[in-house]
């Protein structure tokens, strides 16, 4: 693959981020064949640029899950994926849409089988809304991310609630998912850290060729208010 990067804290692993509908290895520079840049609009309407090796998706076996608390950046979920003899650590802040889909998937997937991880971020032309998240497949079938036990609000809540109430709901929802993933996934499968992959999978980190036509505002991974503002307009 040529994606491995030596980490002083995680051994031989590649740290990956999910942003703008892609998987990014931000440690790579212009010399890497998959190097690319992507502009995004910040919350203050200024334009930022993310850069690094850019990929469409990642296929592999989940061999580790843990939560990490950072003094500056807050809580994140770290998901270790084994693929073709290499390890990739996907790091996502727990208060963004990508992490919600990741946490939902962790409660539904089979950890003994490889999984296809495909982020997306585009504009629904009909509804004129941003559509953002991650889709997952196992055995060629899309994983249904619906978790019936998760906190739920009726349609009337979304019509009448103010931003503070919605913010509180998402905070409660995030807490439910992090607690449930800890109890049902980490404590059960990864209590002692990363495990060995049970199946060798040919690495599939695919570069997306086409550019995103519409650049959407970037959602801060560190501020739920930013997330809600982007979702609610």
Q: Can you say where each PLM-predicted feature lies in the sequence?
A:
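Short, glycine/acidic-rich beta->alpha junctions
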Residues: 98
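Acidic, gly/ser/pro-rich intrinsically disordered tails
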Residues: 1-15, 164-233
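OB-fold ssDNA-binding interfaces and closely related basic DNA-contact patches used
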Residues: 1-91, 101-107, 122-171, 175, ...
